[in-house]
Amino acid sequence: MEEWDVPQMKKEVESLKYQLAFQREMASKTIPELLKWIEDGIPKDPFLNPDLMKNNPWVEKGKCTIL
């Protein structure tokens, strides 16, 4: 391990204290919530619902041609 000076050690301690205080949630709880949020947004999301892309005037309709 390399030699650290006092300011580096203080920064490391502050970072570790911050990480320790951070509230974590179980993945078994958050992953189903995330999947439900994604599934609820499918009707409104043009990236997940291709029918919405048909009404978007900014989507390219054909391939690019070089003049």
From Swiss-Prot:
It comes from Homo sapiens. Guanine nucleotide-binding proteins (G proteins) are involved as a modulator or transducer in various transmembrane signaling systems. The beta and gamma chains are required for the GTPase activity, for replacement of GDP by GTP, and for G protein-effector interaction. It is found in: Cell membrane. Keywords: Cell membrane, Lipoprotein, Membrane, Methylation, Prenylation, Transducer. This is Guanine nucleotide-binding protein G(I)/G(S)/G(O) subunit gamma-13. Residues 65-67 form a propeptide. G proteins are composed of 3 units, alpha, beta and gamma. The modification Cysteine methyl ester is found at C64. Belongs to the G protein gamma family.
